[in-house]
Amino acid sequence: MSKPAARNPTMSVSGYQTSVVRCAVAVVVILAGIAWITVYSHVAMDAANFSASPGLIRPHTPFPWMSDLHKWNYAIGFGLVFLGLIIASHPTTPLGRGRGVVIGMLGSFLIGLAYIVTYYFVGQSTSFHIPVMDQLNQLNLLVGVGFMAVGFTFATKWE
């Protein structure tokens, strides 16, 4: 009886092993974070920001549990985006090896820097409002620093 053949890993054109499942999970988690923030901003935020006054009726929302979380929804949404980027920094994904690490690292750093600079220039203006930035106020700094922290996870994979 002969030995069973060894399982050949999936190789991409570059010669590296690529995990399609890990890539798909990273994309799904990032999209889930974006969807979470979008749903909260467009559907549940009115009920979350409602202050009771005589004669006013609380706005209806299909997600009352989401309205109860208030600004924690932003932490969940951005946390999912950061987690998806961290998953994408694994060496079995294209962003986790070779030039992809540099792209992911510099991209995350520059997105974080641009987010903070945009907040400082536009976020405190009374005439111009960016939908998520005008709700987070000083917490925008944590979002920018979060993107930079994700850049460090890419930097740890750099060879």
Q: Where are the predicted features?
A:
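Terminal, Lys/Arg-rich, intrinsically disordered segments and adjacent short helical elements
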Residues: 1-28, 43-65
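Membrane-helix interface motif
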Residues: 37-54, 117-125
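Structural signature of hydrophobic alpha-helical transmembrane segments
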Residues: 70-79, 137-143
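Hydrophobic cores of alpha-helical transmembrane segments in multi-pass inner/ER membrane proteins
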Residues: 77-84, 143-154
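Structural signal for the C-terminal ends of transmembrane alpha-helices
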Residues: 86-92, 154-157
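Membrane-interface helix-boundary motifs at transmembrane edges
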Residues: 92-99
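Transmembrane alpha-helical segments of multi-pass membrane proteins
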Residues: 100-115
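Non-cytosolic membrane-interface motifs at loop->transmembrane helix junctions
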Residues: 128-140
